[in-house]
Amino acid sequence: EEYETTTYVGYDQNAIYVGAILKHPNPNIMPKEFSQRDEIWDVNAETFFVTFNTYNDDLNFFGFQITSAGTVGDVYSSGSIESDDFLYDTIFDAKTHINSDGWSVEMVIPYSALRFPKKEVQLWGLNFGRKIQSLGETYVWSPVNVNELEYHESNGTLNGIENVSPPVRLFFYPYVQTSVNLRKGEKSTSSYTAGMDLKYGLSSSFTLDASLIPDFGQVAFDNVELNLGPFEQQFSENRAFFTEGATLFEIADEGMGGGSFFYSRRIGEEVSVGDDILENDEQVYDFDSTPQLLNTIKVTGTTNKNLSIGFLNAITDKVEAGIENLSSNQRRRQTIQPLVNYNVLSLSQQLLNDYSSISVLNTNKAGNDGLYGNNLAFVADMFDNKRGFNFKVKAFGSKTPKENSTNGFRTGISLSELKGNFRYNFSWWGVDKHYKQNELGYFNYSDHQSFSSRISYQILKEYGILREYRNYLWFHDTRTFHSSERKLWGLRFGNDFSTQNLMVFEADFAYSSRTRDYDKPRTINRYIEEPENFQAKLVVQSNKNKDLSYRFQWNNFAYFNEDYNEKKSQNRFNISTLYRFSEKFSIALKSNHLNFKDDVGFLESINQDIYFGRRDIRSVENNIDLSYFFDSKKWINLRLRNYWSRAKYDPILFSLNDNGKRTQADYLDLDFDPDTNFNIWNIDINFEWWFAPGSNLVLLYRNQLFKSDNATDLDYFGSLNNLFNQTTQHQFSLRLNYLIDYNRTRKK
């Protein structure tokens, strides 16, 4: 009764009204930490939330949240909640009031913030919830058996809404932005942009999102690292247009090799001038490597037959380079990439029961010079009626005529038990050597297959000091797809548990056999042998509700049976701390350290000869995130990241033999210095003010420094000092985003 929560629901022709009275035994010390919009879960505050499953399909739902500090959030999800689902922003009103018994909530949710069928009597799925921060627990009105079901599958019902018609859902999002760039010794430059996004309800079920003049000038910076591996670094998507409602486009991603069937960073990614473009004695004098995004549209929704549909289209302008002949001084314009059209389609049909579905996805990238890539995915995700077992089948096909004349294929199958203390999983997946997914996706495997099995034990109820406990044993065996030659096999054993004082502990141990690595040589059908190793991971995390909290993680790879008496080892140490000075002011610090001894890495290939070097790698990454809130609608945030990495090579060169072994070669055969000292510094300071529902003003200061050279004699502080000797570019930008709701404007 100390934390009793009472909720109320009402409606009229314009909106749903939600009220709640939330008792608390000590309102004066109830946590009320301020946070940014949608950041409502990992914050030291109580949270009240309500969700509406307007088609009562146990899949798609709208959620609205507010914390005891008055911070609001909203979410739209198709299935399990992902972090990107909180990028859904709509207009609704919510307020809180602290009183002697606890706190209370009032919400006004206009029908324009929802999608629901056009019929006289509505039947919606409904749930309420409350996160009680001091207890580290979340309570819901309609119970969720977490051992059997997920949140979206456990709704109660909302009856009695009658004679309500879906309104015209039309929202305009105009914006203006101005920027100034300053650099010492150079003339300042400025720019101005304006445009508009549009959200329109095509019907009661489907929504059109369009970006008429796209601009993403204030998106967060990427966490760039020194990349010495065979694959490109994958970055998070920071453009809200591509992340909002993205769940439908991610159905094919989970497990079985992972990757991203649709990797939205491909749209508008940088291009480069290849060596085949430049003729003798030519250089580039004018080149913008980032294609201009001309427009984007997205259509999403679910039919009355529980068919979820998502479609996305984007067009980027052609990219040209100005090229000059140094001898004749003649100049020419060369098209580096033509106008490109991107299409993504997702169809997901719920069938048999509330949990099972069959999905088909397609991605297509084509330019004025023809088709770049076409990929097709089929996913059958089947559950029994009691949701005790999951059976999943995936199949993929690819067509990339500019890269490969043969179509590619990959597939996978898995079976999992989902209930009880003991659970298991078996899976197999494979990909042939022709399959390509990187024109509009991200996938690194080729000629690869993997079998894995896992058994786990978990407690279903709290036991003594344990709130949660799980241990697991995992086995995997990987081989080539076509010849079935073994690459490696391994075992992993781990324990995860949390205690009644909200501490979290993890201990993980693994073994990997001697490995045939077919990726490092960057050459088809060639591999290098890697020594077997033992791995260990330890994690300790304190109670996140405390003013001072921390997380510590240590990873170790111990290799043995190395060639050439090498002492290969890898240690990674990560620590993060969060200190809350008050409900309005907090600082988070993160520091990651890597020490990799005697790593053998690719250097270059000349004709049929492939060369490797032996190197020591040191990396340090430091992050600072500082926030101060004036109230729940205005705040200042500082985000700083510094990443340093040094790869120092021994004066030893190896050539790769056909059997994966190495033979020592003459170091003088190497015609470049492979030593690398890499340092990058990013800082963003922004003031943000949400002055009206869905509308905000952002003032941003940003600078970046970057340097990469061969100065591997420098340590972290020496490299940082060297970095600061460069001239810094300073950028100031001001952006105004305004949301116009057609229904509110019409009523005025």
Give a label for each model feature:
Residues 180-182, 349-351, 382, 560, ...:
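Structural motif corresponding to the C-terminal cap of alpha-helices
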Residues 143-165, 319-386, 503-545, 572, ...:
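Outer-membrane beta-barrel transmembrane domain signature of Gram-negative proteins
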Residues 1-345, 370, 726:
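Structural preference for beta-rich elements and adjacent junctions enriched in aromatics
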Residues 292-294, 300, 373, 386-748:
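Exposed, low-structure sequence patches enriched in small/polar residues
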Residues 18, 50, 107, 174, ...:
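Conserved structural-core and active-site-/substrate-pathway-adjacent residues in large, well-folded domains
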Residues 174, 194-198, 206, 212, ...:
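Extended, hydrophobic alpha-helical segments in both membrane/secreted and soluble proteins
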Residues 165-169, 301-307, 349-356, 462-467, ...:
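Glycine-rich phosphate/diphosphate-binding loops that line cofactor/substrate pockets in enzymes
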Residues 21-25, 176-181, 363, 474-478, ...:
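Generic short beta-strand segments
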